[in-house]
UniProtKB/Swiss-Prot annotation:
Pathway: Protein modification; peptidyl-diphthamide biosynthesis. Changing A29D: In breast and ovarian cancer. It catalyses: L-histidyl-[translation elongation factor 2] + S-adenosyl-L-methionine = 2-[(3S)-amino-3-carboxypropyl]-L-histidyl-[translation elongation factor 2] + S-methyl-5'-thioadenosine + H(+). It comes from Homo sapiens (Human). It is linked to Developmental delay with short stature, dysmorphic facial features, and sparse hair 1: An autosomal recessive syndrome characterized by intellectual disability, short stature, and craniofacial and ectodermal anomalies including scaphocephaly with or without craniosynostosis, prominent forehead, sparse eyebrows and hair, hypoplastic toenails and, in some cases, dental anomalies. It comes from the Eukaryota. Component of the 2-(3-amino-3-carboxypropyl)histidine synthase complex composed of DPH1, DPH2, DPH3 and a NADH-dependent reductase. Interacts with DPH2. Interacts with RBM8A. The keyword Iron-sulfur applies. Expressed in heart, brain, placenta, lung, liver, skeletal muscle, kidney, pancreas, spleen, thymus, mammary gland, colon, small intestine, testis and ovary. Reduced expression in primary breast and ovarian tumors. This is 2-(3-amino-3-carboxypropyl)histidine synthase subunit 1. Belongs to the DPH1/DPH2 family. DPH1 subfamily.
Length: 438
């Protein structure tokens, strides 16, 4: 699946005026010309790539041609970089554009780097492997971003058999994953709903079943187990932190192993509360704005600044793409740091820093804007978040169409809303969710 992000002005009117020269929403994915879709040379070139990885090459070529792009930047996580040269060759062969690969580390959707792409002279950015989480700055009408989710097909038969051998019938299961496996996850949910009480929870603006390392839904009390489809534990730990009382399982689609997973909630929370307690006696604060792509939120930074000013606390601002203990040790006069980048950096690695390294939520607790929450909130990009120390706080309160759920609410059986007006043509609009079976 892919999503195209364009400037607001260009999308609303274009050269032909408002509403003209634009196809109805939901039909964009079907507009790829047959001379691209059925091009035998292109089909042969695509076969070099793994058949179970959907890089959406025809759509990418069509979008580049539509935009008349001259220089295209590709951004992808390190796990996909081995395919970058092949994709460059294909795109340069079938378009008129010059294509380059951005090699800086890309941890997630928050790292989409349109700033660097523009600085390098690109007029089109293709971001692979993540969903359209960050609305783009619409001030530049000559720059476009295409998100390619890189849907990965796996052996669902083995997954289903593993679940059936592990859980008795009628067990209430919640299924979650990363964006690459969401379509497989929802197909599996449809297969299981006749035997189990299956839910695919949604934490808007994410897709149904999608979780991030910093954002996961709170599950209903009826859920007896949560199953994560994916490799590694980073995303799984997010939903485990948000739901400490729900047994968690991980199905690795590569090793084909279903395992019971555990997390030391007591140790993590004790470490974070100790950091908060130390911060309450701090005289000098340091505010770090992450500059790795769009990771940092200026809105959150401004909120923190206003709170510190109101309390008469001194602070210094620091812009960093990567946050290391050795870097922060160069400013010994700072008593406590608050990083507006990735909450998991503090949660997972906070004890490695000599001074407290707080998340914006933890800073709010230290400043007594909110009490310590149980369970620990994983709502950094959720629309229905706790407060202005999160990215999308208040989006669920905006007016919405009658009969449609407000953004940010956890819903069953609803399709993903666009992250912004610019994402209206996102093909994930057609995703389905398996509701909780009776």
């Amino acid at each position: 699946m892919a999503a195209l992000v364009v400037s607001g002005a260009a999308e609303q009117g274009g050269r032909d005026g408002p509403g003209r020269g634009r196809a109805p929403r939901g039909r964009v994915a079907n507009q790829i010309p047959p001379e691209i879709l059925k091009n035998p040379q292109l089909q042969a070139a695509i076969r070099v790539l793994p058949s179970n990885y959907n890089f959406e090459i025809p759509k990418t070529i069509w979008r580049i041609q539509q935009a008349q792009a001259k220089k295209v930047a590709l951004q992808m996580p390190e796990g996909l970089l081995l395919f970058a040269c092949t994709i460059v060759d294909i795109l340069e062969r079938f378009t008129e554009a010059e294509v380059m690969v951005m090699g800086d580390v890309t941890y997630g959707a928050c790292c989409v780097d349109d700033f660097t792409a523009r600085a390098l002279g690109a007029d089109f950015l293709v971001h692979y492997g993540h969903s359209c989480l960050i609305p783009m700055d619409t001030s530049a009408q000559d720059f476009r971003v295409l998100y390619v989710f890189v849907d990965i097909r796996i052996d669902t038969t083995h997954l289903l058999d593993s679940l059936r051998l592990t859980f008795p019938p009628a067990t209430a299961l919640a299924l979650v994953s990363t964006i690459q496996f969401v379509s497989t996850l929802q197909a599996a949910a449809q297969e299981l709903k006749a035997e189990y009480r299956v839910s695919v929870p949604q934490c808007k603006p994410l897709s149904p079943g999608e979780i991030l390392g910093c954002t996961s839904p709170r599950l209903s009390k009826e859920v007896e187990a949560v199953v994560y489809l994916g490799d590694g534990r980073f995303h799984l730990e997010s939903v485990m932190i948000a739901n400490p009382n729900v047994p968690a399982y991980r199905y690795d689609p590569y090793s084909k192993v279903l395992s019971r997973e555990h997390y030391d909630h007591q140790r993590m929370q004790a470490a974070r509360q100790e950091a908060i307690a130390t911060a309450r006696s701090a005289k000098s604060w340091g505010l770090i704005l992450g500059t790795l792509g769009r990771q940092g939120s200026p809105k959150i930074l401004e909120h923190l600044e206003s709170r510190l000013r109101a309390l008469g606390l001194s602070f210094v601002r620091l812009l960093l793409s990567e946050i290391f203990p050795s870097k922060l040790s160069l400013l010994p006069e700072v008593d406590v740091w608050v990083q507006v980048a990735c909450p998991r950096l503090s949660i997972d690695w906070g004890t490695a820093f000599p001074k407290p390294l707080l998340t914006p939520y933890e800073a709010a607790v230290a400043l007594r804007d909110i009490s310590w929450q149980q369970p620990y909130p994983m709502d950094f990009y959720a629309g229905s978040s706790l407060g202005p120390w999160t990215v999308n706080h208040g989006q669920d309160r905006r007016p919405h169409a009658p009969g449609r759920p407000a953004r940010g609410k956890v819903q069953e059986g609803s399709a993903r809303p666009p992250s912004a007006v610019a994402c209206e043509d996102c093909s994930c609009r057609d995703e389905k969710v398996a509701p909780l079976a009776p």
